[in-house]
Design a protein with these regions (language model features):
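Beta-rich catalytic cores
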Residues: 90-93, 155-157
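Hydrophobic core register within WD40 beta-propeller blades
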Residues: 96, 159-161
Length: 206
């Protein structure tokens, strides 16, 4: 539709002091934005759930809640509404694609509960968003569905994707400093995935 979608992980939201140092801020584990054509501030449409934007002297001014929470996160709804951020289980953004006039996006599940194995990848969520309307409308980028149990990969397939003319989407990640690749059966991220793997002789195939 001519717009650019941005996703962010572990970002600071809040106020900046006159000397450009960071003031009181929150640290949402993921957030999203749409950039419309142009180079003005109003072309950056932040799809953020702000705690409050009315009183600069009150707590949590322009601080933001995490866009999409992991279902295993343990903070209460009351604490989330107050502006606290999950630190135990979270999602980090993967890549996204357009299918059937909707945006499909992969979110990587991260377990941050083991001090001996922090930031452990343990699965993937497939989320689908509406593209009806225009940025700023309630319908645009509305979350239509999410499959928190899409897969249980410990690798971040789909950190980067390539939509090929052959009808597949190729999903890339790294493992032990080597590239790992999967691909979808169709241009639908929800279609069957297959993996480029080697046999005992080192010959790669799907």
């Amino acid at each position: 539709d001519g717009n650019i979608f941005w996703s962010f992980n572990d970002s600071f939201y809040g106020v900046i002091n006159e000397n450009r140092s960071r003031g009181n801020c929150s640290f949402p584990r993921n957030s999203i934005m749409v950039q419309t054509p142009g180079e003005k501030d109003e072309n950056l449409v932040w799809l953020a759930d702000y705690v409050q934007t009315n009183d600069p002297n009150a707590d949590r001014y322009y601080q933001v809640r995490t866009h999409i929470r992991h279902p295993k996160a343990t903070l209460s709804d009351e604490k989330i509404q107050a502006g606290e951020i999950d630190q135990d289980y979270l999602y980090w953004a993967g890549d996204a694609t357009i299918y059937n006039n909707q945006m499909q996006m992969l979110w990587g599940a991260v377990d941050n509960t083991d001090p001996n194995n922090l930031m452990r990848r343990f699965g993937t969520c497939l989320a689908t968003y509406s593209l009806e309307g225009k940025p700023g409308d309630a319908s645009y980028m509305k979350l239509i569905s999410r499959n928190d149990n899409f897969n249980d990969h410990t690798l971040g397939y789909g950190d980067t994707m390539w939509e090929d003319e052959d009808g597949h989407i190729y999903l890339y990640t790294t493992s032990n400093y080597k590239v790992a690749v999967a691909r979808t059966a169709t241009r639908d991220l929800g279609s069957q995935w297959e993996y480029y793997v080697a046999d005992p002789q080192g010959n790669f195939s799907w």
